[in-house]
Amino acid sequence: MRRLLSLMPVLLALTACGGGGHVPAPVTGKPDAGCLPGDRGYLKAKFRGALESEPDWHGGELQCEGGARPDGSGLRVSFLGPPGAHGERLRLVFGIDAKPGTPRSRAVPTNITVIVEGGKQLYATQGADKCQVETMLQEPLPLPDGAARASSMRDYRIAARGACIDPASSLDGSARLYIDRFDFAGTARFADNELYAATSSR
């Protein structure tokens, strides 16, 4: 979480040049440590251009977190991979135009930010017209046996896959990152009043 907060001045700069795109704000609630139990959390992707990489992260090597966008326009999920050969770490942030808690979604516009932590690189689609989540499932995570619900927050498993038709770019526009595909399952924490069932009944 501290790493993501330290990147916020750069991320916020995207607001001014992003053509109306959503910039991922820090996620509150679930700490940036671990993901889902076992191998239920994962991220797979294929990058070309500025980065030649095919992340395939599972289980304990993956950290994830998520929540609702502050403006109520959808949800976001963040993934942090394991350290590379030189200590750099790759973070992906997905901003998805779907209501929190919606069980199933298809063809959802999505904004993606890719950050190389320790490498001073950031690429963003700067808008939701370049990438699309083809399918997405949101399912509430059960409480541990015998545990009582102590707050109005609920944890969800978010599983999605999709692709991009146009590349992400560096802040100065000099580099392009092509995201051929992505497939992930992570977590998000929502307040009761942020969930689809609550907002749709108003």
Where are the predicted features?
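Short, low-complexity, Pro/Ser/Thr/Gly-rich segments in the mature regions of secreted, periplasmic
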Residues: A185-R202
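Acidic, glycine-rich flexible loop segments
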Residues: R106-A188
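Surface-exposed beta-strand edges and their flanking turn/coil or helix-capping segments
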Residues: L92, D172-A175, A197-T199
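C-terminal motif of bacterial Sec signal peptides marking the signal peptidase cleavage site
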Residues: A13-A16
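Bacterial N-terminal signal peptides that target proteins for export
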Residues: M1-M8
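A periodicity- and composition-biased signal for non-globular, repetitive helical segments
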Residues: M8-P9, A50
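Intrinsically disordered, low-complexity acidic/polar segments
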Residues: E54, P167-L171, N193-L195
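An ectodomain-focused feature that recognizes extracytoplasmic/extracellular
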Residues: G21-V133
